[in-house]
Swiss-Prot record:
Keyword entries, A-Z: FAD, Flavoprotein, Monooxygenase, Oxidoreductase
This protein's name: FAD-binding monooxygenase stcW
Native organism: Emericella nidulans (strain FGSC A4 / ATCC 38163 / CBS 112.46 / NRRL 194 / M139)
Chain's role: FAD-binding monooxygenase; part of the gene cluster that mediates the biosynthesis of sterigmatocystin (ST), a polyketide-derived furanocoumarin which is part of the most toxic and carcinogenic compounds among the known mycotoxins. The first step in the biosynthesis of sterigmatocystin is the production of hexanoate by the fatty acid synthase (FAS) units stcJ and stcK. The polyketide backbone is assembled by the non-reducing polyketide synthase stcA by condensation of the starter hexanoyl-CoA and 7 malonyl-CoA extender units followed by cyclization and release of norsolorinic acid.
Induction conditions: The genes forming the sterigmatocystin biosynthesis cluster are co-regulated and induced on oatmeal porridge or the fungal isolates were grown either on oatmeal porridge or in YEC medium (0.2% yeast extract, 5.0% corn steep liquor). Expression is positively regulated by the cluster-specific transcription factor aflR that binds the palindromic sequence 5'-TCG(N5)CGA-3'found in the promoter.
Domain of life: Eukaryota
Record keyword Oxidoreductase present: yes
Pathway(s) the chain acts in: Mycotoxin biosynthesis; sterigmatocystin biosynthesis
Length: 601
């Protein structure tokens, strides 16, 4: 029996939809986009390269508040300022560098590398310096960010102006806003010199230190590096320490004078790229090899804690110092810091270590929480950076939501890179990001690739706006906080990984660096609210033309599916084909398909 379905109801109205006649499938020329990146450090330089390399019809500008590139590695010039990750693991994958002068580099070495990258790829053409973002507001009607900027040219009054963009990339990082100690009298009572390690003055060097009584506040990485640099030269050094420190060894780095690469080694790396890659991979294997030690009660955690406690005791001979510096928390709760020179410096005759907080400053010195005043000429604040993740300027998203308010108590991001209510916005090194395990370079590349995928999707599908859903973001952060309970970061310690008032861990990704890279390899678009520039979201299909169709004639390969790469060797052998010939033809300019079976049966 045949059943006929009869449409009931009014006849459909004539569609008001009109297909865009000149739209071509997947053609970037369909839509020009403007991108603003904030900051020209490692992340901003990376995005300048990625957009130049992978995109078309994109207008990209990088605004940098400083006078040049480099971010942290431009501004941090305190004595011995450097990176505790091996040089060859601290490079872009597209720009492995044979000429690193030493195994662990100083800030000036790293800046020189970044300068060479920008020169090689002409990336400064996208950058505007001495230009600071002071406000960013999302315009829902236009589907764009309006960005207010302040430019400070030398010898001129500051100039404010507006710009706009479809995508806003925040590459400010977490080490860009120095944090001063909240110490009464530090700035308004003390008559001596006050210095922050993140803004070390050019006129304070060995000559000025020679007879100074110097106080250092803090026991993090900048303190550990700076103390070792100034101790041999100052008249006297007072160091104020509130918490124990894990003096670790990171991929062979003890903080002591590092291996210098010979000219012969550098020449080999230049002439043999495979040797350079092999050396870099061997370092990465070491850098990422400690992941298991961060889980509570694991054998790796217990073994690492015992080893480094014993190692510290063998170097620090003074019982009081050894007891004060030995942590009461697990290995890795605070960032592991190579510090052999520091451990030797604190035992010298011109050094006093005070295991007390700083209570206040007098005109002539520092009063500790123990009530004792120490007379000093200079105070060095090695107090790190504001790590609350709150932006330094207003970022106003949908419905007037200010990211500074949204993140006032608990900074929560989607996969460490996006935020609900902040459309078309990606941040680098956001909350819950793999800052704790190995070099940041591979995860940074993954975030840049993630941003490129969204940028291309906006172009190809004429997307107006996208932002992660609040509910899915909440569930992700619920997972993060539950995961933390199983790790060393749940221990009681003061760390920039945490909100030290509440104890909440804000910085850590719930897994290894490799885990993060795998998770964000492809965006989960189902986690996003997406709106389109056209009323009909299928308008980007156009009149059915592809770029190959438009090219036509002999210029177009209208059968790209027919190629050697798609022939499975198993099939070819089963029908009597010569697999060796197939492989040789592929090797002339092709590779075997990733999904091809390699069985020879």
């Amino acid at each position: 029996m045949t059943v006929h379905y009869v449409h009931e109801g009014p006849e459909p109205q004539e569609s008001r939809y009109s297909i865009p006649q000149h739209t071509t499938w997947m053609d970037p020329n369909n839509r020009r986009l403007r991108v603003i990146t904030i900051g020209a450090g490692f992340s901003g330089i990376l995005m300048a390269y990625q957009i130049q390399k992978q995109c078309a019809n994109i207008e990209h500008v990088v605004y940098e508040k400083n006078h040049d590139i480099g971010g942290t590695w431009l501004t941090n010039r305190y004595p011995n300022a450097g990176c505790d990750v091996p040089s060859h693991a601290y490079t872009y994958r597209f720009a492995l560098y044979p000429d690193w002068p030493r195994y662990f580099s100083y800030a000036s070495d790293i800046w020189e590398y970044l300068d060479k990258v920008c020169a090689a790829f002409k990336l400064r053409q996208y950058m505007q310096f001495r230009t600071e973002v002071i406000k960013a507001c999302w315009n829902e009607e236009e589907g764009q960010w309006k960005v207010r900027l302040r430019r400070q040219r030398p010898g001129q009054e500051p100039e404010e102006f507006d710009d706009h963009c479809h995508i806003l990339l925040n590459a400010c990082g977490v080490l860009s806003n120095p944090k001063w100690p909240d110490t009464p009298g530090l700035h308004d009572r003390f008559k001596g010199r006050v210095i922050h390690t993140a803004a070390w003055p050019d006129d304070y060097g060995e000559v000025q230190w020679n007879s100074d009584r110097v106080a250092v506040i803090g026991s993090g990485a900048s303190s550990i590096q700076a103390v070792a640099g100034i101790q041999p030269h100052v008249g006297h050094l007072d160091i104020f320490v509130r918490t124990g420190v894990w003096f670790g060894v990171l991929a062979g780095n003890t903080g002591a004078p590092t291996k210098i690469y010979s000219e012969a080694e550098r020449a080999q790396f230049r002439s043999n790229p495979s040797a350079l890659v092999e050396h870099t991979k061997s370092i990465e294997a070491e850098v990422n090899g400690m992941w298991g030690a961060f889980y509570r009660d694991s054998m790796a955690q217990k073994g690492a804690s015992a080893f480094f406690r014993q190692r510290m005791a063998s170097i620090i001979k003074d019982d009081r110092l050894a007891k004060g510096f030995t942590p009461t928390f697990g290995f890795g709760c605070r960032r592991i810091t190579p510090g052999d020179p520091y451990m030797h410096a604190i035992q010298q005759a011109n050094v006093d270590v005070h295991f007390t907080a700083v209570a206040s400053c007098t005109e002539d010195g520092i009063v500790g929480a123990d009530g004792i005043e120490r007379l000093v000429d200079t105070i060095v604040c090695a107090s790190g950076f504001d790590n609350t993740y709150r932006p330094q300027f207003p970022i106003i998203g949908r419905r007037g939501v200010d990211l500074r308010d949204k993140w006032k108590t608990n900074p929560e991001a989607y996969l460490g890179l996006a935020v609900p209510d902040m459309p078309n916005y990606i941040t680098f090194i956001g909350p819950s990001w793999p800052i704790q395990n190995g070099s940041v370079m591979a995860p940074l590349h993954s975030v840049s690739e993630y941003a490129i995928q969204f940028l291309k999707k906006m172009q190809n599908e004429n997307i107006r706006a996208w932002a992660p859903r609040q509910q899915i973001t909440d569930r992700f952060n619920e997972h993060v906080q539950e995961w933390v309970k199983h790790t060393v970061w749940s221990d009681q310690c003061r760390s920039w990984y945490k909100n030290n008032e509440t104890g909440r861990v804000n910085a850590i990704w719930p897994g290894s660096s490799l885990h993060y890279q795998a998770v964000i390899e492809r965006p989960r678009y189902e986690d996003f609210e997406i709106s389109y520039a056209d009323a009909n979201p299928w308008a980007h299909l156009g009149m059915g033309w592809t770029m190959l169709d438009r090219a036509g004639g002999k210029q177009a390969d209208v059968s790209p599916h027919l190629c050697l790469e798609n022939i499975d060797p198993v099939w070819f052998k089963s029908i009597g084909g010569d697999v060796d010939i197939l492989r040789k033809q592929l090797e002339k300019g092709h590779t075997l398909p990733n999904n091809a079976s390699h069985a020879e049966a």
